[in-house]
Amino acid sequence: MKVKICGITHPDDAREAAKAGADYIGMIFAKDSRRCVSEEKAKYIVEAIQEGNSEPVGVFPEHSVEEILAITETTGITSIQLSGEDILFKFSQLREHFSIFYVVSVYSNGQPSAALPPMNDAVTVVYDHIGGERGSPFDWKAFSPFQHNNWMLGGGVNLWNIKEGISLLSPRGIDVSSGVECPGILRKDIFLMQALINSAKELSSSTL
């Protein structure tokens, strides 16, 4: 079970997430996000996890191919998460250069908003609740993932519902942001991160 802690805004939080066993550390570059980080801050976050096993992921919902290439070169980010209206074009241009997380937005009723293009299992599909930062899950019981083995469950995952999500859907990974945050300050709660990561790993082992 892979775990991505997304919306990291501080190097200390990245370091603690890596120590807790997070496989991926996500940084958001969307200007309209409360969790948006600058290139300078992202560089510090990448440096904070260099000695561990966590992989830095840049979240790019609105940037051009050229902007993504420039930011990743400046920051040292090695994986990218793509979403937005021109996702197909960006995916075709960047898939040979990066490990890619491909976002499929899901409506509250559990229905995906778009079809999945042809891709191999090297690409990680992330199912996220439309609205992104609402912090609530879509209808997991009504949801059925596409025929693609490597996928993550996102959108409202937290310590209190992770068991249900893994039991119902058996994802290859989970993607969590607000579910491990300290209320009101957009910093991560160390103990919530540790508990959620431990739960994810234990639950995935018990379902094998």
Curated annotation (Swiss-Prot):
<dbReference type="InterPro" id="IPR044643">
    <property type="entry name" value="TrpF_fam"/>
</dbReference>
<dbReference type="Pfam" id="PF00697">
    <property type="entry name" value="PRAI"/>
</dbReference>
<comment type="pathway">
    <text>Amino-acid biosynthesis; L-tryptophan biosynthesis; L-tryptophan from chorismate: step 3/5.</text>
</comment>
<keyword id="KW-0413">Isomerase</keyword>
<protein>
    <recommendedName>
        <fullName>N-(5'-phosphoribosyl)anthranilate isomerase</fullName>
        <ecNumber>5.3.1.24</ecNumber>
    </recommendedName>
</protein>
<keyword id="KW-0028">Amino-acid biosynthesis</keyword>
<dbReference type="InterPro" id="IPR013785">
    <property type="entry name" value="Aldolase_TIM"/>
</dbReference>
<dbReference type="InterPro" id="IPR011060">
    <property type="entry name" value="RibuloseP-bd_barrel"/>
</dbReference>
<keyword id="KW-0822">Tryptophan biosynthesis</keyword>
<dbReference type="GO" id="GO:0000162">
    <property type="term" value="P:L-tryptophan biosynthetic process"/>
</dbReference>
<keyword id="KW-0057">Aromatic amino acid biosynthesis</keyword>
<dbReference type="GO" id="GO:0004640">
    <property type="term" value="F:phosphoribosylanthranilate isomerase activity"/>
</dbReference>
<comment type="similarity">
    <text>Belongs to the TrpF family.</text>
</comment>
<dbReference type="InterPro" id="IPR001240">
    <property type="entry name" value="PRAI_dom"/>
</dbReference>
